[in-house]
Amino acid sequence: MSTPQLMQGMQKDLTCPLCLELFRAPVTPECGHTFCQGCLTGAPKNQDQNGSTPCPTCQTPSRPETLQINRQLEHLVQSFKQVPKGHCLEHLDPLSVYCEQDKELICGVCASLGKHKGHNIITAAEAYAKLKRQLPQQQVILQEARLKKEKTVAVLDRQVAEVQDTVSRFKGNVKHQLNAMRSYLSIMEASLSKEADNAEHTATEALLVERKTMGHYLDQLRQMDGVLKDVESQEQTEFLRKYCVVAARLNKILAESPPPGRLDIQLPIISDEFKFQVWRKMFRALMPALENLTFDPDTAQQNLVVFSDGKSVECSEQKQSVSDEPNRFDKSNCLVSKESFTEGEHYWEVLVEDKPRWALGVISETANRKGKLHASPSNGFWLIGCKEGKVYEAHTEQKEPRVLRVEGRPEKIGIYLSFSDGVVSFFDSSDEDNIKLLYTFNERFSGRLHPFFDVCWHDKGKNAQPLKIFYPPAEQL
């Protein structure tokens, strides 16, 4: 390597990458890169939880206490500074011209005799003016890049916060659900224990009565044993006289002998079926409290008649005189409830009974209510329905609804909505002790959701049965 190349390489190695000047009080982080002490301490930095700061060049974390001034390097810089500033390291002439090809400030000798010979050379003043004009453009490019990365960092920060919030809510939900399970199982344990204690008390009382009776009888037998021994010791005449009396008395006592005591204790059998029933009951106990919904007549299609209690709705052949509200369904025989939800868990039940055609579920605030409805999750509809009284369907993204396998004919449908879990589940809740899952939609919900009811066309009376929101009287809650 020639001396000029060596000097240029040394100058590069002795230059701070932050201020582009020769090192002043050079320090070297643990990663091995070197900076001016003032440049490094003044650089933007983000400390981690251990107090370490990232290297501006490679982002490797470094502990502040490891930063010591490199005295050897500092002395080398001082020696290098003996070359006059603004002079060529090779020829010691002033740096007076600029090589546009190599983008380098050089001296006149370099331009005429050195490696820059034949290149496009301009004066330093011309280069200064030219590059000065280009600087704003570079600043714009830098600003755009910085803003873009700042937006990316903001998005990442928001995603980190969302992840932390999601995990926090998940942990809270897990804790809440498991606490509810523990509470329910504790109540169930106490109930079964009390039932066992009652059975034990009843059986013990009965057995003690039986034992007392048996004790009295045993006393009579022991007494007769003594009498028989006394008769045995008598002379002939006295023996015969007493024996007949004693024998008759003994036969009477033996004839009145109480049957042996036996008592069956009736306790719950801890079988697989029992466990299954407990889990079913616990599942129902863990569901949110039943929502007390009411139909919203302002959203009902013209043929629908909402009963005065707000809990029943049916389809009539006659159109009602109603105003054309923006949120009213105009073609499909549908309506929503007055209540709507934006968060949390919710559960409500609808009596369909023997109605042969219906659809239930939730719709988004932005779902279309005019004209023909295209019921699918992508259009803001999460529904299941029944047709012909026997075909049950889930309105998925498929071209045709998904046919569900349903046992029997559900008379009451339970609908469970969880914003945090992104779930809409449908249950056959006809039997409270035997709730059966029909179908579940999994979705990431945003915005407001409305409980939805499609009464369907009355079909000349064949489908005139009403839909009813189920909510028991207060004394049954």
Swiss-Prot record:
- Which residues participate in Zn(2+) 2 binding? 29, 31, 53, 56
The known PTMs are summarized as: Disulfide bond formation at Cys-244 occurs in case of membrane damage that cause the entry of the oxidized milieu of the extracellular space, resulting in homooligomerization.
InterPro entries documented for this protein: B30.2/SPRY, B30.2/SPRY_sf, Butyrophylin_SPRY, ConA-like_dom_sf, PRY, SPRY_dom, TRIM/RBCC, Znf-RING_euk
Gene Ontology annotations for the cellular component aspect, listed alphabetically? cytoplasmic vesicle membrane; sarcolemma
Binding annotation for Zn(2+) 4: 97, 100, 114, 117
* Activity regulation description: Specifically binds phosphatidylserine. The binding to phospholipids enhances ubiquitination activity.
B box-type Zn finger ranges: 83-124
Q: Name one GO biological process term.
A: exocytosis
Name the reaction it catalyses: S-ubiquitinyl-[E2 ubiquitin-conjugating enzyme]-L-cysteine + [acceptor protein]-L-lysine = [E2 ubiquitin-conjugating enzyme]-L-cysteine + N(6)-ubiquitinyl-[acceptor protein]-L-lysine
Residues that bind Zn(2+) 1: 14, 17, 34, 37
Q: In which pathway does it act?
A: Protein modification; protein ubiquitination
Output the superkingdom of the source species.
Eukaryota
Q: Which Pfam families match?
A: PRY, SPRY, zf-B_box, zf-RING_UBOX
| Family membership | Belongs to the TRIM/RBCC family.
Quaternary structure and interacting proteins, as annotated: Homodimer. Homooligomer; disulfide-linked. Oligomerizes on the phospholipid membrane.
| Record note on domains | The RING domain is flexible in both the dimer and oligomer. Binding to the negatively charged phosphatidylserine lipids is mediated by the positively charged PRYSPRY domains and is inhibited by Ca(2+).
Task: Outline what the protein does.
Answer: Muscle-specific E3 ubiquitin-protein ligase that plays a central role in cell membrane repair by nucleating the assembly of the repair machinery at injury sites. Acts as a sensor of oxidation: upon membrane damage, entry of extracellular oxidative environment results in disulfide bond formation and homooligomerization at the injury site. This oligomerization acts as a nucleation site for recruitment of TRIM72-containing vesicles to the injury site, leading to membrane patch formation. Probably acts upstream of the Ca(2+)-dependent membrane resealing process.
PANTHER family (UniProt xref): E3 UBIQUITIN-PROTEIN LIGASE TRIM
The name on file for this protein is Tripartite motif-containing protein 72
Source organism of this protein record: Xenopus tropicalis
| Upper classification of the organism | Eukaryota, Metazoa, Chordata, Craniata, Vertebrata
